[in-house]
Amino acid sequence: VKGQQTLKAAEVLVYDRLGSEELLSLVPEDCERIYVGKEAGHHIKKQSEINRILVEKALEGKRVVRLKGGDPFVFGRGGEEIQALTEAGIPYEVIPGVTSAIGALEAAGIPVTHRNIARDFHVFTGHISHEGGEGLSGDYSLYAKLPGTLIFLMGLSNLEEIVKRLIDGGKDGETPAAVVTDGTPVSYTHLTLPTT
């Protein structure tokens, strides 16, 4: 409800590719909409430019809403955005949604944990390493030995390599697995600023 009210009061909306038409329809007609959509290998705006837009629009005294798909604080660069706001002295409020790491599985009817089967869960990026520029990051021989549910976000394009590395690391090839894409297209987190 709070997220809905926030969208209805927006003067500037900065939103991603994963924004749903249902949510976008809540924004007032006269709201300035700034599309900053990102997808693998193609960024409309660089992260530094998104940060600059958020700061500039807030400093203009406008009620800015940042609509992000999934969980902005789990591989979503939301931390970088609030860091830019904090450094600029701009107050903000985070209105959390359901993290896609859990919500997508729930929407598919897959328990993240289940008594006597999976008492733990672990979340990893399935994306290419930004540090090295190529290849997956992380110690897959370690991941393969972890108990419980292993969740890889943004890993569809690297699925074959993820599976190979887990099996090479010792994971049983018969381990049950599921692939969920676009599992919760309306699970969003909103950053709202300023909060004066």
Predicted feature residues:
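Short, flexible loop segments at boundaries between secondary-structure elements
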Residues: 178-188
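Conserved anion/nucleotide-ligand pocket segment
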Residues: 137-176
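Short hydrophobic/aromatic-enriched beta-strand-loop microsegments
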Residues: 31-38, 91-93, 112-122, 170-179
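Class I S-adenosyl-L-methionine
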Residues: 3-98
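Short, solvent-exposed amphipathic alpha-helical segments in soluble enzyme
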Residues: 2-6, 28-31, 80-84, 110, ...
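Conserved small/polar residues in nucleotide/adenosyl-binding loops
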Residues: 189-195
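Class I SAM-dependent methyltransferase SAM-binding "motif I" and its flanking Rossmann-like core
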Residues: 69-146, 186
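Short, charged/polar "capping" segments at the starts of alpha-helices
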Residues: 20-24, 131, 161, 186-188
